[in-house]
């Protein structure tokens, strides 16, 4: 009998979609599928840590924030990852002052997503 590793779904609209960020945090590239987070819009915030800015090649973070416009949605990618990869993502995102919440995506599935703390 083979045991499979339990997995969770993680929706990313920002830096966790980048190959170099995935390699640095998970040790491999993730495979995902496109989806969207309805009822949210993207805002940006400056990156304070120069090491993080260098890693991702950007000066600002994307932040998904609830929107009053029902037409708004944030596009991104949903990844199936392990619990240990989720813990690594938590560590990476907490450094950027994000918190993880459970949401329903446009496809109808539930996934974790990081939003501004």
Please name every model-derived segment:
Residues 2-117:
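Glycine-aromatic micro-motifs
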């Amino acid at each position: 009998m083979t045991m499979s590793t339990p997995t969770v779904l993680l929706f990313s609209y920002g830096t966790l979609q980048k190959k170099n960020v995935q390699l640095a945090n998970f040790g491999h590239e993730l495979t995902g599928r496109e989806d969207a987070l309805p009822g949210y819009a993207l805002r940006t915030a400056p990156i304070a840590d120069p090491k993080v800015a260098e890693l991702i090649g950007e000066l600002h973070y994307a932040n998904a924030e609830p929107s009053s416009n029902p037409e708004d949605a944030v596009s991104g990618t949903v990844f199936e990852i392990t619990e240990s990869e989720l813990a690594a993502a938590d560590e990476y995102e907490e450094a950027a002052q994000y918190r993880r919440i459970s949401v329903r995506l446009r496809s109808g599935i539930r996934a974790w997503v990081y939003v501004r703390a």
